[in-house]
From Swiss-Prot:
GO terms for molecular function: dUTP diphosphatase activity; magnesium ion binding. This is Deoxyuridine 5'-triphosphate nucleotidohydrolase. Substrate binds at R65, S66, G67, N78, T82, I83, D84, K92. The keyword Nucleotidyltransferase does not apply. PANTHER family: DEOXYURIDINE 5'-TRIPHOSPHATE NUCLEOTIDOHYDROLASE (PTHR11241:SF0). NCBIfam families: dut (TIGR00576), PRK00601.1 (NF001862). Pfam families: dUTPase (PF00692). It catalyses: dUTP + H2O = dUMP + diphosphate + H(+).
Amino acid sequence: MLKVKIVRLNKQAFLPVYATAHAAGMDVSACLEEPVVVEPFSTALIPAGFAIELPIGYEMQLRPRSGLALRSMITLANSPATIDADYRGEVKVILINHGPQPFTVNNGDRIAQMVVARVEEVSFEEVSELGETVRGDGGFGHTGTVRS
């Protein structure tokens, strides 16, 4: 199991936890002095109250919680959000309200999930052309919407 250092920056912060034994992501909770209202079609930056030190070669992704998206149309504005291994500041979540009603975030509300993953460093080789494939440059819906 990978060990990741974590610092609780606020005594009321909830540290990330796996909700079930085989969950891929850990729940991230809001760390707030007072509730924050995310107005319709607006964003809010919500602190999590902790900072992490990832090993080199890893990243942390913040992702939406499906239940929030389904019930309240709340998701992450930059999904997935990447926390790099050299970042040492407080983890914060950019929530966006796609719904028509204001949404209130309270201290301790589970607002996102985080997944720690390996990252492969790459170098680019500039070439004059790329190898051919059946797909070629087809993209953005080129395969249609109906399964045959």
